Every structure is written in C-alpha cells, then in structure tokens.
Amino acid sequence: MPTQRKIETVADLKQRLERMQVAVVADYRGLSVADMTDLRKKLRESGAEFVVAKNTLTRIAARETGHEAIEPLLEGPTALAFAYDDVPKFVRAINEFNRGPKKITVRGGLLGTTLLKENVLDVVATLPTKDEVRAQVLGGLAAPVTGLAGIIAAPVNDIVNLLDATSKSILYALQARVDQLQPSSTS
C-alpha cells in the first residue's frame, strides 16, 4: 500500500513533468548539501527547479504523464532538473555549475516527450536566451525604423539647404543690384 507521502511525491513529479519544457536527469553523487543548495539557487535564477527523487516514483509519474522515454535514464542516485521557461539559460546554469570543482553527471533529458542525449544539451546551451532573442528582434525592428527616419529627414534637410542656398543667392543678387544703383563715389 503506497504511503500518503509517496502519493504526494508522484503527484508533484507528474505536475512538474506536465509543466516542463525540458527535464535533465543527472547523477548527484559527490555533491555536498552546500553544493546542492548552490545548484538549486543557480537553477532557480534561470526559472528552473532541481529535485532528488526515487527512481520508482519517477517511473510511475513518467508513465502516468506519457513521458516513458525518461525511464532508461533512471538508474542509481537520480536528480531531476526541470526547465519551464528559458531553456538555454537553464542549460547554461547547469554548465556553469559543472565548471566548478563539484559536478553533476548529466545522463540525458527530455524535450517534451522526446529523449535527449547528454551531448544535445551542449548544443542547447549555445542557443540564445529569451532576452537575447528579444534584443535581436527589437534590433531588427529598429533598423528599418531608423532607416525610414533618415529617408524622411533627407527631403526636409534638402529643402532647408535649398532655401538656405536660395536665400543666400537672393541676398547676393540684391546686394549686387544695390551696388549697381548706388552712384559710384569716384564720379
């Protein structure tokens, strides 16, 4: 008979699996509590979560949510990291943590219901984050607007230059005529 705690754990894992865009399965052996806390903090900053779960309970949750593809990765001590929003930022947070003295061993993951090999996550880490994509899109949108402003301003500048040149020409012509009409002082 399953205990209430196990039922709640399965329900929690199901909810996370249903919400996630990417899940990473890792071996956390060798990490201290402080290391795990540091990793959780880094992942939380990227909008992700890191949980340690029993393989049996994870299998049950995976089967009930249609994520059976994760089952081959559930061997030995298992930790799961769930990304809900900005996947490249999430993978970069894991890679950044793994550059330190303590590392987690990434076994693979899920993208939706598709099994990912460990090396695919390295490719995902090279993708731009949401903020970077937004900046690129805004930059792309701003460039034509800036060009349009230049095109619109050009005729106005040309008119101003023409009027300036015309007024100077008229001024010089008037000055020349005034000089002609004035009696010369040598006469």
Curated annotation (Swiss-Prot):
Which Pfam families does the UniProt record give?
Ribosomal_L10
Q: Tell me a GO biological process for this protein.
A: translation
Keyword Manganese (UniProt): no
One GO MF annotation is:
structural constituent of ribosome
Q: Which residues form a coiled coil?
A: none
What is the documented function of this protein?
A: Forms part of the ribosomal stalk, playing a central role in the interaction of the ribosome with GTP-bound translation factors.
Q: How does it assemble?
A: Part of the ribosomal stalk of the 50S ribosomal subunit. The N-terminus interacts with L11 and the large rRNA to form the base of the stalk. The C-terminus forms an elongated spine to which L12 dimers bind in a sequential fashion forming a multimeric L10(L12)X complex.
State the protein's name.
Large ribosomal subunit protein uL10
